[in-house]
């Protein structure tokens, strides 16, 4: 297999390589900044027999370098911003380390850096493909299709002979292919420049999809929902995300030109999120919310503050989401029952802030001030942005007692 891959890598016919390895796949170090053992070993051993995934990719590029510096496009299609840069950074690090250690020529680094020879285009992909769902499996079994049982891998991921994915799909790629490409636009892929890819990403992440998902996740957990699609049958929750998207987000949306933001939201709210065959949960989407609020809502807040003709006071429901998240951190649902918070790297920091707050408390502003002023979480200091007062008001109403979350939604959406 290794011989075949090297043979392919040495051929000029080999024009592009795509990657879907998750954002973590590009990491060369662990959370403490320590090199992964396989990566450290590869740095020392050189490109001949690498053990790490990125090391193997860098080794194949070294093969192309040794066979006439053949051009190629390295296309990351993982769902993360500026994905091409992440792939480049990992590959470039390998090239530099090998050159520093005398295990590869310095010209190999130049080859990786030559835009005419090796490209790392950005892409934006948007297609929800959750793990194989039992309801879909049952439908297929009724059609007398056998052997569908899913398998849990050693890494606790689920695989099956079938895939349940939404029909809607978007793939936008920076048109940077040094060795040419087929006319994939005929299959619906959109090719454009880097700036436009970035705009599409911002449109999706900051306005048209991700903020709506996060809002539903926070309040879905508080109201006991276990499927995002069911939340769209809830009049208050549906109205909430409609107003966040259309009324508060669209006026300052980043318009990429190749996709219409309003049509994108229309599809999200009327087709994608309500799809019962997409068994996504508010609990899954609520994962790492502290890392998401600054991008998914904070950018809209900043755009209002920077605009000469937009009034920050028109933001009514984004502050409600901020307050809802702080209410969520109490780990008590709207029935007064405890629930388990989704994983989040800041739980040990933010949960103690609200730990002493009980339903019915009213004197809470000073208690939650450390959260309200946290730019890392919200993207802005909510006091400086002029949103702290409304956020505190909402929070007080959300903790007024059992049923207060539903009552607050009814009152304001």
Question: PLM ranges: what are they?
Answer:
Residues 2-10, 14:
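Single conserved hydrophobic/aromatic residue that forms the stacking wall/gate
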Residues 15-92:
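Divalent-metal (Mg2+/Mn2+/Ca2+)-assisted nucleotide/phosphate chemistry catalytic cores
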Residues 30-31, 56-66, 178-197, 219-220:
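Active-site-adjacent bridging/hinge elements
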Residues 64-74, 94-110, 222-239, 252-256, ...:
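Inter-helical turn/loop segments and adjacent helix faces that build the functional surface
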Residues 79-81, 204-220:
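Conserved phosphate/anionic-ligand binding catalytic regions in large, soluble enzymes, centered on
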Residues 88, 92, 96-206, 227-229, ...:
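Primary mode marks residue(s) on the alpha4-beta5-alpha5 output face of response regulator receiver
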Residues 244, 270-413:
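Long, compositionally biased intrinsically disordered regions
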Residues 245-264:
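A structural-propensity feature for long, helix-poor, extended segments
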């Amino acid at each position: 297999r290794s011989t075949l891959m090297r043979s392919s890598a040495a051929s000029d016919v080999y024009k592009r390589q795509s990657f879907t390895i998750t954002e973590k796949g590009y990491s060369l170090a662990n959370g403490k900044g320590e090199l992964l053992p396989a990566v450290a070993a590869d740095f020392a051993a050189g490109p001949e027999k690498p053990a790490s995934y990125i090391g193997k990719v860098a080794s194949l590029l070294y093969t192309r370098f040794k066979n006439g510096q053949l051009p190629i496009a390295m296309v990351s299609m993982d769902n993360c911003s500026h994905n091409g840069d992440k792939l480049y950074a990992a590959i470039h690090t390998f090239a530099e380390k090998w050159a520093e250690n005398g295990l590869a020529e310095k010209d190999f680094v130049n080859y990786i850096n030559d835009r005419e020879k090796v490209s790392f285009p950005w892409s934006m992909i948007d297609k929800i493909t959750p793990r194989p769902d039992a309801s879909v499996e049952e439908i297929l079994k009724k059609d007398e299709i056998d052997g569908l049982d899913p398998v849990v891998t050693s890494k606790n991921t689920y695989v099956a002979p079938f895939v349940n994915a939404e029909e809607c799909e978007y793939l936008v790629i920076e048109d940077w292919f040094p060795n040419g490409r087929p006319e994939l636009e005929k299959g619906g892929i959109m090719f454009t420049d880097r700036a436009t890819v970035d705009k599409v990403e911002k449109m999706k992440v900051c306005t048209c999809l991700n903020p709506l998902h996060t809002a539903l996740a926070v309040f879905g957990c508080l109201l006991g929902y276990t499927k995002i699609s069911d939340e769209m049958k809830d009049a208050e929750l549906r109205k909430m995300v409609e107003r966040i998207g259309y009324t508060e987000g669209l006026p300052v949306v980043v318009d990429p030109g190749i996709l219409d933001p309003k049509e994108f939201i229309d599809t999200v709210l009327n087709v994608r999120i309500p799809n019962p065959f997409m068994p996504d949960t508010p609990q899954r989407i609520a994962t790492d919310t502290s890392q998401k609020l600054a991008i998914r809502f904070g950018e809209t807040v900043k755009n209002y503050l920077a605009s000469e003709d937009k009034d920050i006071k028109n933001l009514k429901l984004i502050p409600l989401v901020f307050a809802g998240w702080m209410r969520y951190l109490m780990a008590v649902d709207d029935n007064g029952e405890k629930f388990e918070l989704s994983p989040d790297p800041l739980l040990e920091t933010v949960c103690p802030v609200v730990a002493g707050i009980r339903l019915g408390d009213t004197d809470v502003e000073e208690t939650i001030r450390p959260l309200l002023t946290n730019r890392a979480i919200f993207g802005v200091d909510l006091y400086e942005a002029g949103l702290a007062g409304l956020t505190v008001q909402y929070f007080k109403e959300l903790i007024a007692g059992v049923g207060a979350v539903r009552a607050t939604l009814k009152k304001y959406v």
